[in-house]
Amino acid sequence: MNSKIFAVLLLLGLLSCVLSDQYCPKSSITACKKMNIRNDCCKDDDCTGGSWCCATPCGNFCKYPTDRPGGKRAAGGKSCKTGYVY
């Protein structure tokens, strides 16, 4: 009996994880002057409080995930540096 309850709870937990996809919010900005491009983060570890490192035309910024697709997560990588990008 206990194993059946555990199996059902486990299945419900996995199902809720699959159905609750999270995304970076879509940026309202479509373009940015090169002199204004700034990276506040390069990877999710650079952000705090459950926020993600999301890419925008003006650089990478820590944003809280949303359930609406459209945004883009920052790719990071060795060439990514925080601060202004010239």
Swiss-Prot record:
Transmembrane segments: none annotated. Expressed by the venom gland. Residues 1-20 form the signal peptide. GO terms for biological process: defense response to bacterium. GO terms for molecular function: toxin activity. SUPFAM superfamilies: Elafin-like. One of its GO terms (cellular component) is extracellular region. Disulfide bonds join C24-C54, C32-C58, C41-C53, C42-C80, C47-C62. Residues 21-66 form the WAP domain. Contains 5 disulfide bonds. Keywords: Antibiotic, Antimicrobial, Disulfide bond, Secreted, Signal, Toxin. It is found in: Secreted. InterPro entries: Elafin-like_sf. Has antibacterial activity. Belongs to the venom protein 11 family. 01 (wap-1) subfamily. This is U15-lycotoxin-Ls1d. It comes from Lycosa singoriensis (Wolf spider).
